[in-house]
């Protein structure tokens, strides 16, 4: 997958007025790039997991026709793994979904740590990641919210190690401008699934990665795949 950061434009003279070295401005931009890269990788992995898992009926507990997200529904989703349900070690959900579970008087809401807007908590004895990834909410009739319950190594993101950055200063405008832009790539693998190059292509878009039919299940059993999903009516 290919991604990019920027362009970020600033006037070199601004750093002089602010009495800040140019290196400090580059450091701030670099930190912002690192955060955006991690966010892109996280959201892409979640979108691919939602697509692959929800394309397998045996891995989904869809109660959206009659109900919203509940503790019982989540437990029934775990049951899709049968005697291997203990292998489901992590849950991923949006913030609104998390607060619905809190509102249902779940007592084990211990927060383990927080990184930016991503919270990691404990629900049902499993580590739960709370992040507003777009793929965890789907528009429709009704709108649906999704909780992923995942095994260790459900998704593997690897850096392409081909980050290309360019800083360029240009004349010709009212003020001299410096532009910073960065390109990058990364790879993604899902446990128990393989990417269908014929269907999705060698350089997929976000939409293609989020299409379930582009992920082929290779594991002989759902128990040997990335995990399961609970789908509920977002309005309930």
Which residues does each PLM region occupy?
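Alpha-helical scaffold segments that mediate packing/assembly in large oligomeric complexes
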Residues: 12-84, 202-235
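Short, surface-exposed helix-loop/turn micro-motifs enriched in polar/charged residues
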Residues: 25, 89-90, 153-155
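Structured, hydrophobic secondary-structure cores that serve as assembly/anchoring elements
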Residues: 6-20, 74-110
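Sequence/fold signature of self-assembling virion shell proteins
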Residues: 65-69, 103-236
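Assembly/oligomerization interface modules of large self-assembling protein complexes
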Residues: 1-4
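A sequence-level detector of short, solvent-exposed, charge-rich linear segments
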Residues: 44, 48, 52, 56, ...
């Amino acid at each position: 997958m290919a991604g990019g950061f920027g362009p970020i434009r600033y006037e070199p003279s601004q750093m002089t007025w602010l009495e800040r070295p140019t290196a400090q401005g580059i450091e701030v931009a670099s930190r912002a790039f690192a955060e955006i890269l991690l966010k892109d990788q996280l959201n892409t992995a979640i979108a691919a997991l939602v697509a692959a898992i929800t394309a397998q009926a045996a891995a989904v507990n869809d109660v959206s026709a009659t109900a919203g997200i509940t503790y019982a529904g989540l437990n029934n989703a775990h049951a899709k793994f049968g005697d291997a349900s203990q292998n489901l070690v992590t849950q991923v959900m949006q913030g609104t979904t998390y607060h619905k579970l809190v509102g249902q008087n779940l007592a084990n809401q211990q927060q383990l740590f927080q990184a930016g807007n991503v919270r990691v908590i404990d629900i049902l004895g499993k580590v739960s990641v709370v992040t507003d990834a777009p793929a965890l909410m789907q528009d429709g009739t009704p709108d649906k919210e999704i909780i992923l319950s995942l095994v260790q190594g459900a998704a593997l993101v690897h850096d392409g190690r081909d980050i290309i950055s360019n800083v360029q200063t240009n004349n010709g405008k009212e003020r001299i401008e410096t532009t910073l832009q960065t390109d990058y790539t990364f790879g993604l693998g899902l446990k128990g699934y393989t990417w269908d190059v014929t269907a999705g292509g060698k350089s997929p878009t976000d939409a293609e990665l989020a299409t379930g039919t582009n992920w082929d299940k290779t594991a002989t059993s759902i128990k040997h795949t990335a995990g399961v999903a609970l789908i509920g009516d977002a309005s309930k």
